[in-house]
Amino acid sequence: MNSIINERIAALRAHIAKENIQAFIIPSTDPHLSEYVAPHWQSREWISGFTGSAGTVVVTAKEAGLWTDSRYFLQADRQIEGTGIALYKEMLPETPSIPAFLSSLLQKGDTVGIDGKMFSADEVQHATVMERPTGNAVGSGICLRHEVCR
């Protein structure tokens, strides 16, 4: 399974490099922001192999991380082992937030990609405001399922 996950991450990295995007955020939601999503919309599970109901994956050219809560620490650790995805345990003091993680890796003017259908308008606005001090933009035109998993 891990070789499949590694291939998927490599395909995403190739796609975002082609689109001049430096990081991509993959949530656990669907276009309706449902708590339980249909298999077609389980992009975070598809890219990471992590089957828990809550988590967010961030992929950059060289780094990948999964943020999830304490219900899933053990499960996530097992499921992402060997994938190159680091586990970030939410709500622990040593765990960087996703914006802090991105700020440590991105340069001024870099673009953070999302599938705009998978985030609320408020989440997109919040991300845009949070990234603005470093000059980063949020791009919302990539559909992971249609453009990467061909």
Model feature map: region roles:
Residues 1-150:
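Terminal domain-start leader segments
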